[in-house]
Amino acid sequence: YIIGEKMSENLLSSLNESQKIAAQHIDGPMLILAGAGSGKTKTITTRLAYLISIGIDPRSILTLTFTNKAASEMRERAFSMLDSSMINTPPLLCTFHKFGLLFLKFHMSELNRKNNFIIIDTDDKKRIIKSIDKEITTSLLVAEISRYKNSLLTPSEAKSAAQLKLYQQIAEIYEKYEEYLEKNNLVDFDDLLLLPYKILKNNQKLADEISQKYQYIMVDEYQDTNELQYRLLRLLCSSHSNLCVVGDDDQSIYGWRGATIKNILNFSEHFENTHVVKLEENYRSTDTILNHANQLIEHNRDRLGKKLIGTRQKGDSIRIYESQDENEETRKIIEDIKQLIDSGTNPKNIAILFRVNALSRSLEEGFNKAGLNYKLVGGMKFYERSEIKDLIAYFRILTNSNDNFSIKRIINKPKRGIGKTTIDKLEAKSIESGKSIFDLIQQLDSEEIGSIVGKKNSRTLKVFEASILDLKELLNESKMKFFDSFEETFDYRASYDNL
């Protein structure tokens, strides 16, 4: 390892001039306009390492990304540049939502709520909304509620702003949805940003403390930020102006989920004395591709302006093929792939990109018929799988018996004859008594439960209760013993083997 000043110099040695300027900038706002393939990640990870190498406390640095993958990659690359002794207390490098989660774990009490809240995903959100309203399309309700939150609109403000009857109904559903979340101590993904914003907005002392804690803030993919994220950043920078954002005003494609290009276009107006650095040298694409890209993007009116310069060879010409339908398109792609392979191209160097997963069907069928092996990248994420969400719901119940949301999910998984009508009756009694569904099952005897859901269901629920209580006792014992008992009790493996 190279220590101290020599290390700082060495960190910058592999950067071009524009990258060096960006990496060495310390105080004051900075906008790094980074074109595709211009070494954006290399620049900001080097800047992170550089700040630490010149003696800035790693704990005072906050770097926010949009994906866990980006955060992990940056962390690995930045830390590999430094002596391990310099990062005994590493900087916080995470997604916006992870930062919000960490913040709420410490400060949820500011909203008079407990910090053992449960995060729901999109499927959970849909189920809750569907239980509130079955007339309006669920996907519309999900999108509008998310839009309200990211626009900082409360249910009452959404009602006031609604001019059409449909949107008045949506605002009312939004209000009921928020009441449900609060009552069950649930938060959705939007809340992971909205609730920290509300807390900081209403507590200037806390906002100052957090801002003084994180003296140097960096944000990746700034063109994809929305109004809520911008407002949150303003609060995080309330005691200083050391905000460095990296983005490409030519790559803003997430307007459909609330991102606003104005955040990056107006950054210099939002933050006075902004230092703007343009990364225009492209290390990824051939000159042919860059020339076409530059000519195309010049027609974009809303941009700050930059021109990508190639560092590689000219490359092959771009070919555009317009097909009549997906089958003809697939035939043409297969024909081209076979020609490439016959001419000596390694199949591993061939990739097909498509915008939505549904477009893969025709290609997969065509490849199978043609005898071409392929690897499909993507698909359902591990934690989105139904069986994994069921298991997580079980573990939530084991640690928090007040979690009605989770118990409704797993009370009949694996199937034990408890239907929707029984669950609805239990929930109604839970609301009436002010007790959770599990506490209700636990505190009432079989006869009392039978009067609510019938004798057969009463016996089933009491067996379910006993199983949960037995597992709770094992929770603090050996992990293997607990999981063996869990699998034996609920026979989950057999249940999913039969799917």
Protein language model annotation of sequence segments:
Residues Q163, S360, E364-E365, L372, ...:
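Conserved helicase C-terminal RecA-like lobe
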Residues F99-H107, D250-G255, R284-S285, L376-T399, ...:
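Short alpha-helix plus adjacent loop in nuclease-associated cores
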Residues S38, V219, Q223-D302, K306-R312, ...:
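Conserved helicase motor core of SF1/SF2 NTP-dependent helicases
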Residues L11-G28, L228:
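N-terminal pre-P-loop "Q-motif" helix
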Residues T63, L93, V245-V246, K278, ...:
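Conserved SAM-binding loop
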Residues I32, A36-I44, M108, K114, ...:
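Helicase P-loop NTPase motor core
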Residues I2-G4, E9, D27-M30, G35, ...:
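A basic/glycine-biased coupling hinge at the interface between accessory DNA-binding modules
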Residues R47, E73-M81, F99-F103, I128, ...:
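Alpha-helical scaffold elements adjacent to nucleotide-binding pockets in ATP/GTP-utilizing enzyme cores
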